[in-house]
Amino acid sequence: MAKESKLTAGVAAALTVVAACALCLLLPATARAQLRVGFYDTSCPNAEALVRQAVAAAFAKDAGIAAGLIRLHFHDCFVRGCDGSVLLTVNPGGGQTERDALPNNPSLRGFDVIDAAKTAVEQSCPRTVSCADIVAFAARDSISLTGSVSYQVPAGRRDGRVSNATETVDLPPPTSTAQSLTDLFKAKELSVEDMVVLSGAHTVGRSFCASFFKRVWNTSTNPATAIVDAGLSPSYAQLLRALCPSNTTQTTPITTAMDPGTPNVLDNNYYKLLPRGMGLFFSDNQLRVNPQMAALVSSFASNETLWKEKFAAAMVKMGRIQVQTGTCGEVRLNCGVVNPSLYSSSSAVELGSSAPAAVGEEGYAAS
C-alpha cells in the first residue's frame, strides 16, 4: 500500500511538472519578461566572470572557437528555443539528439568550452546557473573578443529536457532562399532586418565543403563537372573548386573561412564581400538579390558601427526565443544530460535560488 501511495505521489508530481511547463510554453511573452540583466547578482555574483574566463582561455588557444560559440547559441535558440537542448548527448525519449543531427554534426563546436564554464560555475555556485544561460554568456563573450562589441545579457533561462534531431529542420540551411529565410526567422519572431543583421556572423568562422559544393560542381554528371553559380565571382568559384575538388564527399574534413579577408574578426567585411559575389553560401547571395535585404546589406557595408549596434540588439532578441523560466525546465547539473528524476521533479525550486540538498554527486552523470 505504501508503495502504491509513493507511486501515486510520484505520478502526481510528474503531472504537475508537465502541466506547469505546458502553461509556461503557452505564455512565451511572460517567460521572456522574466529574463533580466543581473539575474545571478545575488545567487552567483561571479557567474558571468567565470564563463568569460573559460571562453578567454579557449580563445587564447584557438581564436576560431569564438565563431563556434556564437553559432552554438544560434543553433540552440532556433530549435525548441534557448534551452540548452543542443548540448544534450542523450535524448530521454530515445532517438537521435539535435547535437547528432547533420546540421550540427560534425560542424558545431564549443561544447568543451561550455562544459569547462559549467564546471567552474558549479564549483562556485552549485545547482544555480543554467547551461542555457552559459551558452548565451559565452556567445556574448565571443563577440566581445572578436569584435570589441559588448552588451548585457538578460538571464534566467531554464534548461530543457528534450532534444530531437528531427527538429533541426528549424535551422536555416545554406541553400535557403530569401523567402525561406524570411519565413524561418518570422517563425521565431525575428524580422527581415534581424535576419540580415544576424547573417553578419558569417564574417567569422569556417565551413565544410558540403555547404557550398553544389555551387561550384555539377553533381548530376559523373565525374562532377565545374560550374559557376551565377551569384559567385568566377575567381572565387575557382578558388573554392581548388579547395574542394570534385571527389569531395559529405564527410570530407576540409574547411574554408567564410570571410577570407578577416576570418577571426567580427567586422562588416561580410557585407562588403556580398556585392562582389563572395558570399560563401547560396543563402548569403540571397541577401544581395532581394531588394529589401540588399538595401540593408549596403547600409551595413558602409557603416560598421551601425551594424555592430544592431547585431548586439539582435543577439539579445534572439536569446529570448521560446525560453523556459521560473519553474519550467531545470538547472541541468551536467550540460550533456538531463538531471536525475529526484532533482528534476523538484520543480518548485526556481533558477537562481538554492536547490534541495538531497541530490548528491549522482547528478553529474557522464555525458
UniProtKB/Swiss-Prot annotation:
Its EC number is 1.11.1.7. Heme b binds at H202. GO terms for molecular function: heme binding; lactoperoxidase activity; metal ion binding; peroxidase activity. Binds 1 heme b (iron(II)-protoporphyrin IX) group per subunit. SUPFAM superfamilies: Heme-dependent peroxidases. Expressed in the root tip meristems. Its cofactor is heme b; Ca(2+). Disulfide bonds join C44-C125, C77-C82, C131-C335, C209-C244. One of its GO terms (biological process) is response to stress. Glycans are attached at N164, N218, N247, N303. Ca(2+) 1 binds at D76, V79, G81, D83, S85. The record marks R71 as: Transition state stabilizer. Pfam families: peroxidase. The modification Pyrrolidone carboxylic acid is found at Q34. It catalyses: 2 a phenolic donor + H2O2 = 2 a phenolic radical donor + 2 H2O. Its main location: secreted. Residues 1-33 form the signal peptide. Belongs to the peroxidase family. Classical plant (class III) peroxidase subfamily. This is Peroxidase 1. It comes from Zea mays (Maize). The gene is PER1.
